[in-house]
Each structure stands twice: as structure tokens, then as C-alpha cells.
């Protein structure tokens, strides 16, 4: 049971079938697994389809962002997230490779850290597949280093394909 703690933002994505099924089912089951492990799910964005990058011929990704709470410290939480990825068949073969599940720690209550965990996530401000669902559940979020709001960050992105909300 969660004793809770600060509000934390995580991003989830998948573009390969996992033991849980197709990508959207994988995200749902991964969120349920996190909850079973004591991570309180506060809110979850809609699911979005995003073209794969850097190879758009790879299957498209399904992406979402969730606001969660846990008493785990960032390093402990990242270890837990990586464990859940592994449970769902994640293989770390190459950067940006297709994957059954990817869970990124985006923000841990506004903390700024380097080392074993970099917070906020170093590329979150450049990723529409993070910012679009993030804007849906946390429209007032501000990047702890850049000081910009999620809307400002989205407006600054080059148009590389906007994520499409899934029904």
C-alpha cells in the first residue's frame, strides 16, 4: 500500500507486442503492475499513436504519461520501472530500437539531479510524444530547469508529426 509522497511524472511507450499483448494493452497492464507494486496512479493521459523515430518504417508507438506517487527515491523508482520493463519483455538492444515497453521517469516533484538518474528527463522537452500527453494531465507543469511551461515547450518544437489521440 502506498504511503504516497511527491507527484511524479512517468512516460510510457511501446511499439512491439509484449507478453501482455499489443502496445495499448501493454501500457494498461504495466500501469496495473506498477499499482500492484505500490505505486499510486493519480491520473493517466489518453493513449497516443506516434510515428517511430529515427526509422519511420518501424511500427508506430503507443504513448501515454501518468502522474503517480510513491515514497521511493528517484534511483529506487527508476530501478522499479526498469524491472517492470523487463517483466514485459523489454530487451535493451540499441538506442531508439523498437520495444515492448519503455517507461521513463520525466519529473520527480521538480527535482533537478544528475548522476545515476537525470531529472528532469534530459530529452522530455524535445519530445512531442511526451509533451502532448503531459499537457493533457498536467497543463500547469513547468520544466524545472528551463522554467518553461508545457505549452511553451510544445510551441517551440519543430513539426515532426504530432501524436494522434487514440479512441
PLM segments and residue spans:
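Nucleotide and nucleotide-moiety/phosphate-recognizing core
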Residues: 2-10, 16-95, 100, 109-110
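Flexible, gly/pro- and Lys/Arg-enriched active-site loops
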Residues: 53-60, 78, 82-167
Amino acid at each position: 500500500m502506498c504511503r504516497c509522497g511527491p507527484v511524479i511524472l512517468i512516460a510510457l511507450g511501446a511499439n512491439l507486442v509484449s507478453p501482455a499483448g499489443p502496445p495499448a494493452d501493454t501500457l494498461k497492464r504495466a500501469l496495473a503492475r506498477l499499482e500492484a507494486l505500490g505505486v499510486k496512479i493519480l491520473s493517466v493521459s489518453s493513449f497516443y499513436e506516434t510515428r517511430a523515430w529515427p526509422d519511420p518504417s518501424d511500427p508506430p508507438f503507443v504513448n501515454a504519461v501518468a502522474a503517480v506517487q510513491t515514497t521511493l527515491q528517484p534511483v529506487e523508482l527508476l530501478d522499479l520501472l526498469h524491472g517492470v520493463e523487463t517483466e514485459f519483455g523489454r530487451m535493451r538492444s540499441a538506442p531508439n530500437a523498437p520495444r515492448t515497453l519503455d517507461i521513463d521517469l520525466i519529473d520527480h516533484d521538480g527535482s533537478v539531479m544528475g548522476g545515476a538518474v537525470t531529472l528532469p528527463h534530459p530529452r522530455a522537452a524535445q519530445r512531442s510524444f511526451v509533451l502532448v500527453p503531459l499537457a493533457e494531465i498536467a497543463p500547469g507543469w513547468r520544466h524545472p530547469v528551463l522554467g518553461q511551461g508545457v505549452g511553451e515547450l510544445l510551441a517551440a518544437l519543430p513539426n515532426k508529426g504530432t501524436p494522434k489521440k487514440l479512441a
